[in-house]
Structures are given as C-alpha cells and as structure tokens.
Amino acid sequence: MEGVLYKWTNYLSGWQPRWFLLCGGILSYYDSPEDAWKGCKGSIQMAVCEIQVHSVDNTRMDLIIPGEQYFYLKARSVAERQRWLVALGSAKACLTDSRTQKEKEFAENTENLKTKMSELRLYCDLLVQQVDKTKEVTTTGVSNSEEGIDVGTLLKSTCNTFLKTLEECMQIANAAFTSELLYRTPPGSPQLAMLKSSKMKHPIIPIHNSLERQMELSTCENGSLNMEINGEEEILMKNKNSLYLKSAEIDCSISSEENTDDNITVQGEIRKEDGMENLKNHDNNLTQSGSDSSCSPECLWEEGKEVIPTFFSTMNTSFSDIELLEDSGIPTEAFLASCYAVVPVLDKLGPTVFAPVKMDLVGNIKKVNQKYITNKEEFTTLQKIVLHEVEADVAQVRNSATEALLWLKRGLKFLKGFLTEVKNGEKDIQTALNNAYGKTLRQHHGWVVRGVFALALRAAPSYEDFVAALTVKEGDHQKEAFSIGMQRDLSLYLPAMEKQLAILDTLYEVHGLESDEVV
C-alpha cells in the first residue's frame, strides 16, 4: 500500500505531508513519489512495532518501538486511516504468524540443548570425583581389589554416559539448527536477504561469467521488490562487468570498489545519478593501475592467461569492497552484508558439526542488524551503534548490539585465522582449525564448548575436499590457475578484514567493553 500521510516532524514544522510505502513488512517514507529514487528518509519494521489508535483524534495513529522509534501519523480522513490500519495490521500479523511456529521449535530445541549441556556439567563433576576416588584406591595398594574393580566400573559407566550425552547434544544441534533456519534473515533487511540467497547458489550452480551472475542477482531482487530493470541500468551492469574482467587480467591489486551495492538503496532502489561517474572513476583506476603496479610476480596475469573465479572473488559484498567513512567509520550495512557472505565457509567445513558455531555467528549478525534497522539514518556506522549504547548505559546489557558485535568480531577473527593458515600453506584442515581456535575463541569458551569443538574437528574435511568446495565451477580446483587465484583473492580479502577488526578492537578497548566472561 502507498499514499500520503501527515507525519509529525517537530514543534517548528508541525505536521508535514510525506509519501509512505508499505512493502515487505516495512513502512518507509519519502518527501514525494518523485523523490523515491533518492532512497527513503526513514522506515519502521512492522513486525516489532506497536500500532496505537489515538483516543481523541480519529484520523491519527502512532507506530511505536518502545524506547527506540516513534512515528506519529495522521490521515486525511477517517476512512483513509482505517485503510492504513487494516494494511499495517495485516502486514504485522502475516509476519508474526509465519515466524511463530519456527521460533517456537527453535526455542524448544534451544531449551533441550541447554538441558543436555547441564547434564554434561553434572557428568563432568562426577568424572572428577570418580577419578579422585580411583587415585585413592590405587595409592592404598591392591588389598581391596574388589573395591578397585567397582570404582573402575563406575568410572567407565560415567564416561560412556558423558559421551552419549555429548552425542545427543550434537544430534539436537543437527536437527534444530538447519541451514534454512540459520540463514533466515530478519525482516527489514531486503538487501541482506537478497545477498544471502545469491550466496547459497554459488557452490551449486556453475556461473559462466560475471554478467550472468549479476542478472541472476537482479532477478532475485526484483522477485522480492516487484521492480523492473530498465535499459539504462542493464547497460550499466554490462559495462561494470566488462571492467571487472579487464581489471582481473591487468592487475590483481584492483578491488571492486565500485560494487553494485553502492547503487542500491535500503529499499532496493537504484541510485542513478552517480552511475556514470562511478564508471569513469573505475576506468581511471584501471588506467593508473596498468602503469603503476606493485603486485608480486606470481600475482600478475599475462594477457590471455585463464582467470578462474573463486568463492571469494564471486562474493557480492566483501570486506575488501568496504570503503571506510569519516574517522574510520565502518558502514553498518556493508559490514553486515560482508559477514553474511563469509558464513558459507562454515558450511564447506561441515554444515552439521559446525552448526553451533554458525548459529552463534548468524545470531550475532541478526542482533546487530535489528538495532540498525530501528534507525538506519543514525546508525550508519558500527561505531555509532556502540557509542549510542554506551551513552544509554546499555552496552554491557545481555543481548545488546554491543555484546553481539563483540562476539561477532571474535567469530570473524577465528575465520580469519583459519583462512590465514590455509593461505600460508597449511594442508591439514584440522591443524589449521585448531591453531585458529587456540589463538581466538578458546580463551572465551568453557570446557563444554571446547569439547564440542574438539568433536567437530574430527569431522573436518580433507584439504582437497575443502578447496574443491571453494570453486565456482566443478573441477576448477585441479587447475594451477585456481591456486594462484586463491592466493590473489585471499591477499585482498584477509588484510581488509583484519583492518576492520583492528578498528573494532580499538573501539572496545578505549571504552572498556571487552569481556573476560567464559561461555
């Protein structure tokens, strides 16, 4: 639904007419329909807001997220307000109904998992006691052999029960936290949902060229937002893809700074006024890099040599694409999209055994995104979100965006450490994972979580299987050009990721937000 409503702005301007659009469970507003291509001035998520009808004014309605966001609106007539109330209520009900069943199942399985982990702690205490008892019997000699046999039998039984309970924990995790549930993007982030769906296609569908991938992405976006690509935008995408292919052949140091995400607004609308200027800047970068290259010899591509795409080069949004804002500000939307893009690496390591790690990573991304969508105009950078919660004295409250970002950066450090091990030539995936875990997450985990991770390590794939999973086209991993391409892509990806994590580390250290809590 769309139309004009009056929105309360401030005491100076009072009620001002704005053009509102209800689409995909999100109510957004603009100055006018003609200015919609510039992007919305604000939006509110219907699934999490309250709809209140004014007790006196029969043309007024209020949309409220308590403590976060307030929309005071007036319709031009009672009948028009009624139409909006029906549309807003229906959007809220549909979103709630579709999520209720899955959320209920998710909550039940989470509680079951917590219960099993409590049992694990109990069995651990019993094991410690029984080991001490066994030591006592051993030191007293063999005079009471019958008691020694009983203690040994009891210890063996407890060990078996402990392992069985641990196995049940993994079964619950496998049954509860499937890929579909983990990838479920919170309503209100259409761009992230679009990016997520295209990432899932890459390991399965061979993509012959970059243009074909972009058209597939556009189709996905249009399916959810009811848009059409016009001729000008199609030409723009073709030109940009030809530039990308040319840049890969000339110089590996060129990153795709002119990512198509820069031309997509929060509501999925394409910004047109900067398109040709971006192409000119990109072309200038290509000309300059052709004469001033600083790549290593093995990274350079001779003209005509095969360029094989990898998982990292086909990402729609990558950490290497992110341009920092003023004062090293990390753009929130681009960062979260890049986090979603790297999550499939855990699937390639084992979608079942790494489900708890993946669940934690995606859950933290969603928590930060939920904070972001409450006020996209204000929370343009991660720093602004953290500082807002610091000033409100809620930064260290459980489930806050600041806490979620803390665990998110820890999880990203683990992935970065693992990929660094692989890039440096480690051929044993178990060793690479263990080294990365020991340097990053291990210090923050208790013995139960460490045990689960140790169990997951045993199911890690071989180096050949993991590398094969990073290909876009089946069989590419057997080519020498693919190994060179992996080195090239990781040499761009990992330093950019490290730089942004270092900025977040500094932010948390300055404000004393790091935590020694063990989970």
UniProtKB/Swiss-Prot annotation:
Complex formation: Homodimer. Interacts with ARF1; the interaction together with phosphatidylinositol 4-phosphate binding is required for FAPP2 GlcCer transfer ability.
Membrane-spanning parts: none
Keywords, ordered alphabetically: Golgi apparatus, Lipid transport, Lipid-binding, Membrane, Phosphoprotein, Protein transport, Transport
InterPro entries with a match to the protein in the record: GLTP_sf, Glycolipid_transfer_prot_dom, PH-like_dom_sf, PH_domain
Positions of post-translational Phosphoserine modification: S145
GO molecular function, one term: glycolipid binding
Tissues where the protein occurs: Expressed in kidney cell lines.
Keyword Membrane attached: yes
Protein name, per record: Pleckstrin homology domain-containing family A member 8
GO cellular component: cytosol; Golgi apparatus; Golgi membrane; nucleoplasm; trans-Golgi network
Membrane-topology descriptor: Peripheral membrane protein
Annotated localization: Golgi apparatus, trans-Golgi network membrane; Membrane
Protein source organism: Homo sapiens (Human)
Recorded domain comment: The PH domain of FAPPS binds the small GTPase ARF1 and phosphatidylinositol-4-phosphate (PtdIns4P) with high selectivity, and is required for recruitment of FAPPs to the trans-Golgi network (TGN).
CDD domains to which the protein is assigned, alphabetical: PH_FAPP1_FAPP2 (cd01247)
Start and end residues of each PH domain: 1-93
Known function: Cargo transport protein that is required for apical transport from the Golgi complex. Transports AQP2 from the trans-Golgi network (TGN) to sites of AQP2 phosphorylation. Mediates the non-vesicular transport of glucosylceramide (GlcCer) from the trans-Golgi network (TGN) to the plasma membrane and plays a pivotal role in the synthesis of complex glycosphingolipids. Binding of both phosphatidylinositol 4-phosphate (PIP) and ARF1 are essential for the GlcCer transfer ability.
Region of interest called Glycolipid transfer protein homology domain, as start-end residue ranges on this chain: 310-519
Residue positions where Phosphothreonine is found in the record: T139, T153
Major place of residence: Golgi
GO biological process entries: ceramide transport; ER to Golgi ceramide transport; intermembrane lipid transfer; lipid transport; protein transport
